[in-house]
Structures are given as C-alpha cells and as structure tokens.
C-alpha cells in the first residue's frame, strides 16, 4: 500500500460466498485506513486471508463505506496500536498523536513511522486506534499540551507597511 495523501477510514464488511455446505457464512468487519476504496478492499482481503481461511476468489465484499468523524472540529488525543515489520523483525508499538480526526492521526502515524524508523506503508499494520482521555496519555510530547494556561511565544516578525518608505532612518520594532 502507498500511503499517498491523507488516508481515509473505511468500514469494510465481507464474507465467504454462500455454498450448499455453508448457506449463511459469517460476516467479518474491519476498520481500514487507506487512500481510496479500492485499496481499502484490497487490504481487507489481505488481512482476512491471514486471520481466516478466506480468499477474495471465494468471497464477496458486502459493504465498503467511508466513516465520517463525529466531531471533526475538536482536537483529540489518539492512541495507535500498530505492528511494524522492520529489517530486524516484527515489533509491536503504541504511539500517541493529537489531531482533529482519526484518519488524520493515522496519516500522521504513517509519516512519523517513515521518518523515525524508515518504515514503509506496506510493513505497518494498524491494529487499533482509540480516542484517549487526557489523564490516560503516557507520552510527554502529547501531555505538554494538556495545560489550561498554555502559552505560546509570539513570532519575531517584521511588519511590512504598504505605504511606509522602503528606506528609513529608524530600525523596525519586531517586539510585540
């Protein structure tokens, strides 16, 4: 899988094709993070074939739909449990991100894993993503933003006034 652009969250439901032996096969549902619905269905069959004796050739996709965030304007903390196949073996990881949506947090996770561990998207398996409360956060990089009296430094900027002369005898004041 190529994690191109921002990933989207899909709910994919699939099952084995009904047969004489098994007329009502059980449905399997997964949350898949993928750039589009084609990749989402492909990842679903990849994971299902690892977990159950199912293949796309003798199965069917019942539903594949986009999952929309309930509150996309509220900043939330997300815990991401993932499995990474690195050059030295398979590693389980827990990472925390702060973002507006679940899919944005997972996209951030893919970028972070690529930057810190040189992990390619195909070798990262997202196992669970959960919104976590502020008191349950473990990582100091996320906990630093849980201060109600948080202050950020003002940028040291030069204001370019449109009608002021370009050359003047006075130095610009950049402290506000």
From Swiss-Prot:
A cellular component annotation (GO) from this entry: ribosome
One Pfam match: Ribosomal_L18A
GO MF assignments: structural constituent of ribosome
Keyword Membrane: no
Record function comment: Component of the large ribosomal subunit. The ribosome is a large ribonucleoprotein complex responsible for the synthesis of proteins in the cell.
UniProt similarity note: Belongs to the eukaryotic ribosomal protein eL20 family.
Protein name: Large ribosomal subunit protein eL20
Organism of derivation: Salmo salar (Atlantic salmon)
Record gene name: rpl18a
């Amino acid at each position: 899988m190529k994690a191109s652009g921002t990933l989207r969250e899909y709910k994919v439901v699939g099952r084995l094709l009904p047969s004489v032996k098994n007329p009502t096969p059980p449905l399997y549902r997964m949350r898949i993070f993928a750039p589009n619905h084609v990749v989402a269905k492909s990842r679903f069959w990849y994971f299902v074939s690892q977990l159950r004796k199912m293949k796309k050739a003798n199965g069917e996709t019942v539903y594949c739909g986009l999952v929309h965030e309930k509150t996309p304007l509220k900043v939330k903390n997300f815990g991401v449990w993932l499995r990474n196949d690195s050059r030295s073996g398979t590693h389980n990881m827990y990472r925390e991100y702060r973002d507006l949506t679940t899919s944005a947090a997972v996209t951030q996770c893919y970028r972070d894993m690529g930057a810190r561990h040189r992990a390619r998207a195909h070798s990262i398996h997202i196992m669970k993503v959960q919104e976590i409360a502020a008191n349950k956060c473990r990582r100091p990089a996320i906990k630093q933003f849980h201060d109600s009296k948080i202050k950020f430094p003002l940028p040291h900027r030069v204001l370019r006034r449109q009608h002021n002369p370009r050359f003047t005898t006075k130095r610009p004041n950049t402290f506000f």
